[in-house]
Amino acid sequence: MASKGETGILTLYSDVQATAVRWLWYPFIAVGKITLLQGDPGDGKSTMMMNLIAELSKGGKLPDGKAVGLSQRVIYQCSEDGVSDTIKPRLEKCGADCRNVAFINEETYSGLTLDDERIRQAIIEFRPRLVVIDPIQAYLGSDSDLQIAGRARKLMQRLGMWASVYDCAIVLIGHLNKKEGTKGLYRSLGSIDVVAAARSVLQVERDPENADVRIVRQIKNSLAPSDGEIRFSITAENGFQWLECEIAQDPAAEPETPNFESKSEKAAYLIKKLLSEGDMRSREIYMRMSDEGISRRTAENTKKELGIRSYRKMRQWYWSIQPEE
């Protein structure tokens, strides 16, 4: 006999608890979902993303001025530039905290593909809030992978599952095809299944009235109203600069980090916020606390006050707010 909420292989929607979409950057990049950032080569896609990564990694501000809050970890996997002579200097120039930005070394782990199990393992170990693949075309098993509908669909389903299960946003950076005059959604390289799987599609274009300015338009949003556009400039004199952007606020957003009267009060807020996303290694929590000016001793005392339990798994200690089973 089927249990409550089930009829054979079916589950009733009445037994599903509805949850709000969580955003890394509303309404452009959602946590647990795939976002596609596309544009012509040289239009600043990677530069824009590196500047966003920098703000996330140091707990800075989003382009609309909203505070990031806690510093976030990011995996930035890029095959088009040298790690030591290009990517690292560019991240540093953007002001990134490179202790929170990682990559899979392709000199050691060659042949990396979009649905590679090593990417999943890296996500499990590093627990990033954002994973960026730049460009998507460089991480295909063969040139035809994005062209064949069935293969592209399976690739995207696998990535989407990783984003959901491991609670991170995945951004795929892609080049546009040369079909001028066609609708933006159909200018992505490869099968339309790639665009179909992405919950948000952002397209970078040059401002026709100012070659130094880029306009980022959201040409697809399956999770929220498409509202506003992003602008940034790239000049020899000033480098990269975010320009004014008017973006609607996430109606389900939490209030920004409050002011604290003591280190213990701040530690309690941060620990509860970190563990609300799931159990976390104690070593990682201590590191996050240190980044926020909280000592190990204060973190341990606060843990006791909050009744946080710890347990050992695979030779590592974890903290949890969940009751012991």
Q: Each predicted region: which residue ranges?
A:
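C-terminal regions of RecA-like/P-loop NTPase motor modules
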Residues: 2-10, 41, 124-127, 165-166, ...
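Conserved inter-motif catalytic segment of the P-loop NTP-binding fold
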Residues: 3, 10-13, 19-20, 24-26, ...
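Phosphate-binding/switch region of NTP-binding enzymes
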Residues: 36, 42, 47, 77, ...
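Hydrophobic positions on the alpha1 helix immediately C-terminal to the Walker A/P-loop
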Residues: 48, 52
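Gly/Ala-rich phosphate-binding loop of Rossmann-like dinucleotide-binding domains
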Residues: 57
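Conserved beta-strand segments of alpha/beta enzyme cores
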Residues: 99-102, 200, 309
